[in-house]
């Protein structure tokens, strides 16, 4: 119908106006477009992401900005209004959003209350990236305590139920709990006394934690050094023993301690591992695991005579040194082995070619070496030596024998190098160095030595019970690291001890070296046994 025709119609005339499907689709599109952006800009005024979690987990609304950033920005804002939350959360969740002023004590005591009267706003529920477990951010905008910005304590993401403490002028703590923890006044309570007691203990603990946090001396710093702890060779050796214990019935015999750490070895002994030094202690035909430190060819021959099932957990870096010693000995080289002659790793390497290998323990031993001018020389080192001492010995060897050769990539383990490098960067700024490790660990003792030669006191401790608190007097800055055979949980025990009363050190992570951890598989014959057992 044209405009002229429409205008010529009388009032009594009837006119039917039809809308095409295309026009109707366009209309719906623009309507949806308008509502979407209206919803988006309205959401931008709030401080959190609103997620509609229905029974089928549909219609999840997200914000591009980080949840934490939005949350923290809202806390910093002076107004602290939650317009969007009030409107939508009440509809999506059955969480009481209105609480009377005189009901606040009952909220603290975890009793029931009805959502009415003058109110505070409780904000929304948000989801983590995996969409499986949910966090609850609770924020109370209290008009009765208006005038001072609320202080929010960050939550622990790994707890199933999270809470936020809000401190007002009266230093009063108010705790809000998720939907499942809130009951109606006329409802039943499950173990009210136990629940109240548990909540009160948590509240007191949170209050004490914040009080201790405020009481920290900013000058007292605990530097937790990275990298630290297990190297790949150690973790591979431990995993080898654990897999054998799963695959076969205990006992499982291990030649020498699998790694030089008493805590690790005691744990494996409880599971059924037996550490031996003499192969006569192993029954014929039984399984024998070689430790991460390597083994000499003579031991392998004895094992074959006893028809033992050998599983070699030797660190691949130690095995690399063995291969070079064998190869150079066949090429008529004389081998100079830098290390400690009583160390199990050096014993294994030396016995690869005892007729042409010379052990050097210190700089003075270099003076005792005499070779013909045309003699081919090759040097290797114990993988856990101090870089400082080793550098001095190597320099003297090169000065005396300019034609001497070595492994292109070096002999010292990457983990030993990285842990010493990281410690050397920070220890000179500290008053004390604490190395977590066993007294039988060579690389642990070298970490202590590395700090001491830089005039920084250092102690080697196996457990937190070995710590003498007297040494912490007048100590403001501590460098904390651990040996390559030390479990991380032992280091964390020191962190927990030193960052809590009575010490109250402030924890700071220090990245002293970048570490590329190699990807080494378990011994081949063990992997084959595992596959056969699975079949």
UniProtKB/Swiss-Prot annotation:
<keyword id="KW-0560">Oxidoreductase</keyword>
<keyword id="KW-0414">Isoprene biosynthesis</keyword>
<feature type="binding site">
    <location>
        <position position="293"/>
    </location>
    <ligand>
        <name>dimethylallyl diphosphate</name>
    </ligand>
</feature>
<dbReference type="GO" id="GO:0050992">
    <property type="term" value="P:dimethylallyl diphosphate biosynthetic process"/>
</dbReference>
<feature type="binding site">
    <location>
        <position position="441"/>
    </location>
    <ligand>
        <name>isopentenyl diphosphate</name>
    </ligand>
</feature>
<keyword id="KW-0809">Transit peptide</keyword>
<feature type="binding site">
    <location>
        <position position="485"/>
    </location>
    <ligand>
        <name>dimethylallyl diphosphate</name>
    </ligand>
</feature>
<comment type="subunit">
    <text>Interacts with Fd/ferredoxin.</text>
</comment>
<feature type="binding site">
    <location>
        <position position="260"/>
    </location>
    <ligand>
        <name>dimethylallyl diphosphate</name>
    </ligand>
</feature>
<feature type="binding site">
    <location>
        <position position="442"/>
    </location>
    <ligand>
        <name>dimethylallyl diphosphate</name>
    </ligand>
</feature>
<feature type="binding site">
    <location>
        <position position="293"/>
    </location>
    <ligand>
        <name>(2E)-4-hydroxy-3-methylbut-2-enyl diphosphate</name>
    </ligand>
</feature>
<comment type="similarity">
    <text>Belongs to the IspH family.</text>
</comment>
<dbReference type="GO" id="GO:0046872">
    <property type="term" value="F:metal ion binding"/>
</dbReference>
<feature type="binding site">
    <location>
        <position position="343"/>
    </location>
    <ligand>
        <name>dimethylallyl diphosphate</name>
    </ligand>
</feature>
<feature type="binding site">
    <location>
        <position position="441"/>
    </location>
    <ligand>
        <name>dimethylallyl diphosphate</name>
    </ligand>
</feature>
<feature type="binding site">
    <location>
        <position position="260"/>
    </location>
    <ligand>
        <name>isopentenyl diphosphate</name>
    </ligand>
</feature>
<feature type="binding site">
    <location>
        <position position="293"/>
    </location>
    <ligand>
        <name>isopentenyl diphosphate</name>
    </ligand>
</feature>
<dbReference type="GO" id="GO:0020011">
    <property type="term" value="C:apicoplast"/>
</dbReference>
<dbReference type="GO" id="GO:0051539">
    <property type="term" value="F:4 iron, 4 sulfur cluster binding"/>
</dbReference>
<feature type="binding site">
    <location>
        <position position="443"/>
    </location>
    <ligand>
        <name>isopentenyl diphosphate</name>
    </ligand>
</feature>
<feature type="binding site">
    <location>
        <position position="485"/>
    </location>
    <ligand>
        <name>isopentenyl diphosphate</name>
    </ligand>
</feature>
<feature type="binding site">
    <location>
        <position position="442"/>
    </location>
    <ligand>
        <name>(2E)-4-hydroxy-3-methylbut-2-enyl diphosphate</name>
    </ligand>
</feature>
<feature type="binding site">
    <location>
        <position position="443"/>
    </location>
    <ligand>
        <name>dimethylallyl diphosphate</name>
    </ligand>
</feature>
<keyword id="KW-0934">Plastid</keyword>
<comment type="pathway">
    <text>Isoprenoid biosynthesis; isopentenyl diphosphate biosynthesis via DXP pathway; isopentenyl diphosphate from 1-deoxy-D-xylulose 5-phosphate: step 6/6.</text>
</comment>
<dbReference type="GO" id="GO:0019288">
    <property type="term" value="P:isopentenyl diphosphate biosynthetic process, methylerythritol 4-phosphate pathway"/>
</dbReference>
<feature type="binding site">
    <location>
        <position position="343"/>
    </location>
    <ligand>
        <name>isopentenyl diphosphate</name>
    </ligand>
</feature>
<feature type="binding site">
    <location>
        <position position="315"/>
    </location>
    <ligand>
        <name>[4Fe-4S] cluster</name>
    </ligand>
</feature>
<feature type="binding site">
    <location>
        <position position="442"/>
    </location>
    <ligand>
        <name>isopentenyl diphosphate</name>
    </ligand>
</feature>
<comment type="pathway">
    <text>Isoprenoid biosynthesis; dimethylallyl diphosphate biosynthesis; dimethylallyl diphosphate from (2E)-4-hydroxy-3-methylbutenyl diphosphate: step 1/1.</text>
</comment>
<dbReference type="InterPro" id="IPR003451">
    <property type="entry name" value="LytB/IspH"/>
</dbReference>
<feature type="binding site">
    <location>
        <position position="441"/>
    </location>
    <ligand>
        <name>(2E)-4-hydroxy-3-methylbut-2-enyl diphosphate</name>
    </ligand>
</feature>
<comment type="function">
    <text>Catalyzes the conversion of 1-hydroxy-2-methyl-2-(E)-butenyl 4-diphosphate (HMBPP) into a mixture of isopentenyl diphosphate (IPP) and dimethylallyl diphosphate (DMAPP). Acts in the terminal step of the DOXP/MEP pathway for isoprenoid precursor biosynthesis.</text>
</comment>
<keyword id="KW-0933">Apicoplast</keyword>
<keyword id="KW-0004">4Fe-4S</keyword>
<feature type="binding site">
    <location>
        <position position="231"/>
    </location>
    <ligand>
        <name>[4Fe-4S] cluster</name>
    </ligand>
</feature>
<keyword id="KW-0408">Iron</keyword>
<dbReference type="GO" id="GO:0010322">
    <property type="term" value="P:regulation of isopentenyl diphosphate biosynthetic process, methylerythritol 4-phosphate pathway"/>
</dbReference>
<keyword id="KW-0411">Iron-sulfur</keyword>
<feature type="binding site">
    <location>
        <position position="443"/>
    </location>
    <ligand>
        <name>(2E)-4-hydroxy-3-methylbut-2-enyl diphosphate</name>
    </ligand>
</feature>
<feature type="binding site">
    <location>
        <position position="413"/>
    </location>
    <ligand>
        <name>[4Fe-4S] cluster</name>
    </ligand>
</feature>
<protein>
    <recommendedName>
        <fullName>4-hydroxy-3-methylbut-2-enyl diphosphate reductase, apicoplast</fullName>
        <ecNumber>1.17.7.4</ecNumber>
    </recommendedName>
</protein>
């Amino acid at each position: 119908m044209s405009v002229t025709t429409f205008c010529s119609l009388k009032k009594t005339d009837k006119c039917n106006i039809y809308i095409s499907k295309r026009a109707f689709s366009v209309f719906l599109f623009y309507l949806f477009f308008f509502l979407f952006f209206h919803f988006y800009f309205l959401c931008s005024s709030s401080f959190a992401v609103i997620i509609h979690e229905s029974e089928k987990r549909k219609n999840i609304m997200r914000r591009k900005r980080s949840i934490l950033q939005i949350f923290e920005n809202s806390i910093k804002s002076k107004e602290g209004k939650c317009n969007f939350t009030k409107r939508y959360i009440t509809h999506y969740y059955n969480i009481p959003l209105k609480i009377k002023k005189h009901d606040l004590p009952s909220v603290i005591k975890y009793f029931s209350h009805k959502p009415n009267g003058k109110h505070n706003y409780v904000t929304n529920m948000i989801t983590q990236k995996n969409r499986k477990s949910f966090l609850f951010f609770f924020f109370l905008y209290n008009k009765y305590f208006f005038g001072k910005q609320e202080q929010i304590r960050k939550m622990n993401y790994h707890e199933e139920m999270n809470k936020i403490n809000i401190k007002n002028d009266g230093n009063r703590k108010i705790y809000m709990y998720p939907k499942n923890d809130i009951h109606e006044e006329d409802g039943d309570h499950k173990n009210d006394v136990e629940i109240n007691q548990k909540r009160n203990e948590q509240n007191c603990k949170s209050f004490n934690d914040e009080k201790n946090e405020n009481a920290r001396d900013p000058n007292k710093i605990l530097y937790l050094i990275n990298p630290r702890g297990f190297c790949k060779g150690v973790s591979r050796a431990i995993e080898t023993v654990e897999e054998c214990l799963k695959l076969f019935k205990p006992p499982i015999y291990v030649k020498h301690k699998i790694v030089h750490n008493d805590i690790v070895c005691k744990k494996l002994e409880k599971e059924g591992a037996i550490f031996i030094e003499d192969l006569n202690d192993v029954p014929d035909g039984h399984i024998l695991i070689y430790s991460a430190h390597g083994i000499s060819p003579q031991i392998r021959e004895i094992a074959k005579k006893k028809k033992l099932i050998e599983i070699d957990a030797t660190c691949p870096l130690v095995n690399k040194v063995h291969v070079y010693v064998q190869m150079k000995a066949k090429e008529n080289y004389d081998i100079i082995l830098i290390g400690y002659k009583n160390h199990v790793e050096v014993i294994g390497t030396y016995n690869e070619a005892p007729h042409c290998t010379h052990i050097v323990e210190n700089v003075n031993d270099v003076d005792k070496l005499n070779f013909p001018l045309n003699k081919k020389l090759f040097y290797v080192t114990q993988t856990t030596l101090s870089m400082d001492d080793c550098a001095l010995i190597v320099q003297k060897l090169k000065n005396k024998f300019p034609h001497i050769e070595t492994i292109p990539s070096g002999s010292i383990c990457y983990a030993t190098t990285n842990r010493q490098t990281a410690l050397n960067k920070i220890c000179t700024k500290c008053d004390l160095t604490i190395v977590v490790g066993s007294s039988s660990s060579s690389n642990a003792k070298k970490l202590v030595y590395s700090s001491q030669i830089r005039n920084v006191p250092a102690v080697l401790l196996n457990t937190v019970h070995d710590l003498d608190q007297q040494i912490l007097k007048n100590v403001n800055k501590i460098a904390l690291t651990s040996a390559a055979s030390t479990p991380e949980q032992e280091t964390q025990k020191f962190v927990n001890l030193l960052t809590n009363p009575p010490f109250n050190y402030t924890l700071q992570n220090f990245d002293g070296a970048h570490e590329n951890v190699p990807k080494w598989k378990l011994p081949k014959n063990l992997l084959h046994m595992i596959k056969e057992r699975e079949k």
